[in-house]
Amino acid sequence: MITNTAAYQFAPIHDPQQLADSVLERAQQRALKGSVLVAEEGINLFLAGDAEQIASFYAWLHADARFAQMRVKYSHSAEQPFARLKVKVKPEIISFRRDDASPLQGRAPSVAPAVLRKWMQQGHDDHGRPLVLLDTRNAQEVAYGTFQGALTLPIDKFTELPEALQPHRAALADATVVSFCTGGIRCEKAALWMHAEGMDNVLQLEGGILGYFEDVGGEGYDGRCFVFDERVALDAELRPLVDGAACADAGKI
């Protein structure tokens, strides 16, 4: 059984290459595979391997004060979903190219999965404001599933979101907007940018879709959540669509 993890943390990294080298060394020692991006703004990890080795790696990373509060999201598969280990230094851990959306200057307010589930059941937030769920992912991902009634955008990459959102701004003015994505990293930057643009009633979904599945299940969500590895997508119980030879409905959305 393979333990799969997704985690990120925005934090000032003064020497990204040094951190990347340390991560690579310790992940290799534990025979982990996956993808890690390091930048001056933080770290973004998708790693998979033996459960004990995964626990040891994250114990090492959590011992660094910059990552002590980093949430790790877990799922399992019979097969290793990554072919190799890649650790790279990039300008951003998720490319957005907006100076007015830096998480190092402060986080956007968030909403917990259980609270969002309650709001969806009510049809409004706790103040009676209408609720709009904003999917910040690209069209390929959305095709596998999204929250019921979510506002989706015809984008192929995250950097296209600001322009694609412009026609909807007036309709969002009187609503409480909850931005969401796979694991939280894109919706965090999107929420910050929206606040910088004067859209004050914007929250990010804490932990993203995977955090929602992990905490409260799939209520209010239709379909699966696309992931960028050989599993292709996960259902609300975090089971992979494709898992080596064991892949019922493989390739189906």
Swiss-Prot record:
UniProt-listed InterPro entries: Rhodanese-like_dom, Rhodanese-like_dom_sf, TrhO, TRHO_N
BP-aspect Gene Ontology terms: tRNA modification
Keywords: Oxidoreductase, tRNA processing
Catalytic activity: uridine(34) in tRNA + AH2 + O2 = 5-hydroxyuridine(34) in tRNA + A + H2O
SMART domains: RHOD
Broad class of enzyme this protein falls into: oxidoreductase
Chain ranges of the Rhodanese domain: 127-221
Function (record text): Catalyzes oxygen-dependent 5-hydroxyuridine (ho5U) modification at position 34 in tRNAs.
Protein name: tRNA uridine(34) hydroxylase
Originating gene: trhO
